Regions:
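Short hydrophobic alpha-helices and adjacent helix-cap/hinge residues
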Residues: 1-330
Length: 330
């Protein structure tokens, strides 16, 4: 069931001292606190929320002090997003922070008047979120992590580790709107490397066992997990454990995957993207218009390698790859 975490309501007990408050101070207390709607297709994530709050803080907004936040999480059930978005519109929030690609598309369909700030791992122009990166137009702007664009690089890195393998696989969620773009990009990369690529699909946890059984049957050299995928991202620990259990070298976009025991991660900085969304939300609360705020591309890309997992898989990471790593987990 989708999660609702409502705005924090702070009640002050007014005693006799209230009569001595300056008139201006009392007037300030009566001004309604702006509300930001936080819409996400995944499960509650403290690190992402903290990054979003940091962005708000940069513009002078502190949750519970001068801004309230309505948290709506779909917990990987994308069909719940329309109802969650409609609820935020009904509440007339000041800004909607749509912090995943499915959430961004859903929010865009739900309102043309409430400002929307998104984060996505795909091309927001191709998704129809904005007219252009430099001039978004309308009520929508945000940040892109370029994770779709760097997915071919993940295949290159994996092949560099496994130069004798010629069969690889890509795991995607078929319900996500950018799966076709991702699959097309990686198929092109595989052809350029002379590799055979199989596309495997999972939209529920029940699909995972079949996916890894297929990988073993295909004798796949390694697995690339599709970037920018909220359902898969929220289950990075489970995927890391399955990859290790079935001895499948795997690479994904998020740092959390490598920290959870995955072999490698390579992708844009998710936390930086959430921070940008928070900062843009704050600027809009101060009066700026989404159409005047260009879509930001978070160009910071990180390669994380888990050497403990590599040893468990019997892999020796080439020194050239280790030298490029931003972080090595021993």
């Amino acid at each position: 069931m989708a999660s609702y975490i409502g705005r924090r309501k702070f009640l002050a007990t007014l005693g006799g001292a209230a009569a001595a408050w300056p008139l201006a101070a009392r007037a300030q207390q009566s001004v309604p606190m702006p509300v930001v709607g936080f819409l996400n297709g995944g499960s509650p994530d403290a690190n992402r929320v903290a990054a979003f709050r940091r962005g708000l803080n940069e513009t002078g907004y502190v949750e519970g002090h001068n801004v309230a936040i309505e948290y709506h999480w779909a917990e990987g059930q994308y069909d719940r997003l329309p109802a969650l978005a409609r609820d935020l519109v009904r509440r007339q929030v000041s800004v909607i922070a749509a912090t995943s690609t499915p959430a961004a598309i859903t929010a865009r369909a739900a309102t043309t008047t409430i400002p929307i700030v998104f984060t996505t791992s795909s091309d927001p122009v191709e998704l129809g979120l904005v007219a252009s990166l430099s001039r978004p137009s309308g009520n929508v702007t945000g940040a892109t992590q370029l994770n779709i664009e760097v997915t071919p690089k993940r295949l290159e890195i994996l092949h560099e580790l496994l130069p004798t393998a010629n069969v690889f696989a890509l795991l995607v969620n078929p319900t996500n709107p950018y799966t076709e773009i991702l699959s097309r990009n990686l198929q092109a990369a595989a052809r350029s490397l002379g590799l055979q690529l199989h596309i495997l699909q999972a939209s529920t946890e029940h699909d995972f066992d079949a996916v890894f059984a297929t990988l073993v049957k295909l004798r796949s050299g390694g697995l690339v997990i599709g970037g920018g995928e909220v359902f898969l991202d929220s289950r990075h620990g489970q995927l890391a454990a399955l990859a290790l259990r079935h001895a499948v070298p795997t690479i994904y976009q998020g740092r959390d995957f490598a920290l959870a025991g995955g072999l490698m991660s390579y992708g844009g900085s998710t936390m930086d993207s959430y921070r940008v969304v928070g900062a843009y939300a704050g600027r809009i609360l101060k009066g700026e218009k989404p159409a005047d705020l260009p879509v930001q591309q978070t160009t910071k890309v990180e390669l994380i390698i888990n050497l403990k997992t590599a040893r468990a898989l019997g892999l020796e990471i080439p020194p050239t790859v280790i030298a490029r790593a931003d972080e090595v987990i021993e």
